[in-house]
């Protein structure tokens, strides 16, 4: 039986209506693919608590949870990932790539030019449809 993991991904939008995209490190599972930054929800955490904590840990900036955006489950070879993405905004600090290879800001209509991790694709498509 495959392990199930519940994770959060932050859809962080700036004042220019661009979305923060994170390139997974080659050392990570799904390396060299793009994702919305985030991570595992710890036991007892709400989605908003998890996303604020994960972004503080990964990008060293503070965000505000705005709203849940998409809930998607994707089955990989060894694990089932339930990814909940949420719209967020930065309240202090500047995101820096510590765990990722690179961070970029992209207009929503250009998101599909990147090669995304499979679990993130439904949220990317939903964002583009809403433009």
Predicted regions and their residues:
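Short secondary-structure junctions
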Residues: 58-64
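NUDIX/MutT-family hydrolases
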Residues: 87, 96-127
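Hydrophobic packing within well-folded, soluble alpha/beta domains
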Residues: 10, 47-55, 68, 86, ...
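Generic C-terminal helix-cap and adjacent flexible tail
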Residues: 1-3, 128-131
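Conserved N-terminal beta-strand and adjoining loop/helix that marks the start
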Residues: 1-19, 40
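Active-site-adjacent beta-strand/loop module that shapes the phosphate/pyrophosphate-binding cleft
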Residues: 14, 62, 71-94, 104
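Conserved Nudix-box catalytic region and its N-terminal flanking loop in Nudix hydrolases
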Residues: 18-57
């Amino acid at each position: 039986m495959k392990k199930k993991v519940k994770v959060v991904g932050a859809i962080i939008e700036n004042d220019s209506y661009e979305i923060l995209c994170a390139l997974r490190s080659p050392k990570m599972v799904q390396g060299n693919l793009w994702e919305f930054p985030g991570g595992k929800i710890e036991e007892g955490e709400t989605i908003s608590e998890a996303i604020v904590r994960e972004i503080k840990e990964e990008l060293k900036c503070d965000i505000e949870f705005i709203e849940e955006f998409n809930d998607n489950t994707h089955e990989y070879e060894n694990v089932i990932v339930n990814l909940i993405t949420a719209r967020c905004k930065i309240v202090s600090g500047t995101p820096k790539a510590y765990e990722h290879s690179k961070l970029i800001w992209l207009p929503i209509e250009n998101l599909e030019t990147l090669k995304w991790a499979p679990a993130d694709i439904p949220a990317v498509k939903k964002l583009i449809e809403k433009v």
